[in-house]
């Protein structure tokens, strides 16, 4: 598909690679489309669509002393026209010429890497399709069947919607919200009749990423990302509650169900109770758990841990890999093929960092347990930082699941019913790091903190500022519920794909009373 800019994303990749004069080159072309809907005071207010295009060129100069002796220059530009492609390549090459040797330098991934869907065959020059050797969708030698998404290294060939390298970039449009909007309209009218006000937004994006390298890799991934956030207020605007959901296509969003849950919380808040700061047994819903554990995940880098700079550093040197963090049999994991949370199954790195590397572009990703049955099992690493830390290579993956292996984990409603006295949170926000050595975080509760006594919610209490370490919290888990898909409220702009349980934490530190509402 040729766009208004003149070339398809695939052609842009090929022309940039053809124009390159550096020893190696990596090109990433991304096309993103979006649709959104907003409402306030029970009235639809705006809707819109968007489209954007991004080109990243990574030029690599080799200095003749092996694959680890190289420098890299990176240039990213939006809306690049055909006549500007070569200029972007030259800018990247100039940046590489001026750069010092990169500490993460390495050889590029080759098309023979397992999982290189869309890789170029060096002998024939053809782009591998989903059923060819070295690609996802591998046939089972014994059964002849096609591997599905839930099997390692596979795309489902029976899903004809899975595009190949040569297929046009996928796009979203306002129609993805059509059925949702119809149900939303009914929900807004019901809220109006009941004397409640609903505010919120729904948005959907679809990004097609095309990755090509001078080593022959050609990989493509389409990533749908959607979310809805809904806020309910009483008619006098004194009571407020929030709910959110992440989605791939809005077919699984029950906006009426979300609104019903908010109505119940507004009713809980008709009675208010003042509580002082202190340590409380606390029920955290999945959204709050995801915000805390997402930050833990982002902080779980191998390089800085090996350097003694983080909570995952071992006193005296090394990392805490193998150390038990929780008495509960909990596992924190990522899997690019997790049902409902699928993400890119290969590394896409626009820049190098402590635990990411532009030299790793195209490396296949596989399911990784960061915490396994309560013990620290892996840290995020590039090939370089894994070598520094003396650990296996485990790059970051764009989803996160936290679950217990205990039998019959309860739903949040059952956890409330079995509670003697505890706080029940709605969500967290304004989360900031205080101390990386303990991963102490501070932040605020928002849109509803409730007191539970003898199995029932008895009223709403004031908001608090909290000071907690998610690592320390793991050691004080009393109960872990059933894992469900959720939306991190604080980090949902950056990290959308999560499945978390509600948890019961002993002594959650509400450090001060907050006047925030």
At which residue positions do the language-model features occur?
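Dual-mode signal for accessory low-complexity, basic/Gly-rich regions
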Residues: 317-517
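Active-site bordering "gate/hinge" segments
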Residues: 1-357, 372-373, 456, 493, ...
